């Protein structure tokens, strides 16, 4: 998952939803059946920010009467006050400290951290760029990785794997990590921020066993 916008800053314009949709486009997600889970406060500030824009009259009426955004930026917006909140640890800046730097790694040896990164925090690595999943051409933005369980101040575990070998058909980033490359986390240290989520309908699946039939 990619994060766009500025954590902790109200979503008060269409630019952030458009960037969310653009990231899905860049990763070849289908353009139909997209949905966005958004908390009530973000929903309110976004509706206020859209008030001056030219929109279909029925959409404006729904926003004012129902307080719901409806469809925008190729996505159907749904209010949800159970949106997950990320709590950053007390340090968000560090760097690579040598170690194993081969393609496919899921952990980095690091230094410069005074506190262990929390599971779920998102970070980028200097010089490691996101790529188109089919053409493998590099995008201008850095690849984002998510901290997994077990990270410490010297060992940063993450997902997805950092696959930068051009010969690997599963390559997902461009560039080569190196000693002393900066590691930068999304958001400020010791801060909490909500994470509204835009996704395609088929991003998740619910699987269950057959229910027991009672005679």
List PLM regions with ranges.
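Short linear motifs in intrinsically disordered/low-complexity regions
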Residues: 3, 13, 40, 56, ...
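Residue-level detector of functional hotspots within protein domains
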Residues: 10, 15, 20-22, 32, ...
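Glycine-centered flexibility motif
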Residues: 27-28, 74-75, 104, 178-182, ...
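Internal mixed-charge
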Residues: 141-144, 148-215
